[in-house]
């Protein structure tokens, strides 16, 4: 479901005893996650580690069909080609998501007046073959969202309905299980690129507008 207000609990800094217990529990868990040695996102080590585990982003294939199960088996059995993830194909959905993920994160931080911390690929504390790479976790102790995870999808063409696709819902469940946290916000954004300055100026839509610079290694 889509909710206009994502705050589902009271301020964790409330003097209420139970809320303080919850705050301490979340704070302790975040310290545990921060202490885990993790490869940097999208580094060679990060891709290698992800390939050696079932991650939150692909584990949904187990539940879809026999075909998708075989797809997952093939992905894990074939040799890993890291270069395919580093190709500067600016038209691919993968590149689109990587390009606009920081912008989506800043938007989330802006509307919620908080800060999101990035994590790498986190292994499950008990089942080492399961891992998750959250797009971020709110680690600001003064925020009402303290301890909440964030999953971002940057839509290329499809319409945003406010209802997460099943594979995204499964992905968030696995992320919360791996990180031992109880909440995850799902943020879908859709960006429109203007081909020239004139189109940008003449656009009369009421959507948020702005410009940013992106540097690509050739």
What name fits each language-model region?
Residues 1-99, 193-195, 200, 206-218:
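Charged, glycine-rich intrinsically disordered N-terminal tails and low-complexity linkers that flank
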Residues 63, 90, 106, 112-113, ...:
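Homeobox/homeodomain signature
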Residues 94-116:
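Acidic-basic catalytic patches of nuclease active cores, encompassing PD-(D/E)XK
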Residues 110-134, 138-218:
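Nucleic-acid nuclease catalytic cores
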């Amino acid at each position: 479901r889509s909710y206009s207000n994502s705050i589902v609990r009271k301020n964790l800094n409330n003097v209420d005893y139970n809320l303080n217990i919850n705050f301490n529990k979340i704070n302790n868990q975040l310290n545990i996650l921060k202490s885990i040695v993790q490869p940097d996102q999208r580094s060679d080590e990060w891709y290698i580690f992800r390939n050696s585990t079932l991650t939150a982003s692909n584990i949904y294939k187990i539940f879809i069909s026999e075909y998708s199960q075989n797809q997952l088996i093939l992905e894990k059995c074939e040799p890993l080609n890291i270069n395919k993830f580093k190709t500067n194909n600016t038209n691919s959905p993968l590149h689109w998501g990587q390009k606009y993920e920081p912008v989506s994160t800043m938007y989330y931080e802006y509307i919620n007046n908080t800060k999101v911390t990035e994590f790498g690929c986190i292994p499950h504390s008990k089942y080492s073959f399961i891992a998750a790479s959250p797009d971020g976790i709110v680690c600001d102790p003064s925020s009402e969202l303290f301890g909440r995870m964030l999953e971002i999808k940057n839509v290329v063409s499809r319409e945003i309905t406010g209802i997460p696709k099943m594979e995204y819902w499964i992905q968030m469940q696995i992320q919360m299980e791996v990180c031992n946290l109880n909440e995850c916000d799902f943020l879908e954004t859709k960006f429109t690129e203007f081909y020239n300055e004139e189109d940008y100026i003449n656009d009369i839509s009421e959507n948020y507008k702005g410009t940013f610079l992106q540097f690509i290694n050739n």
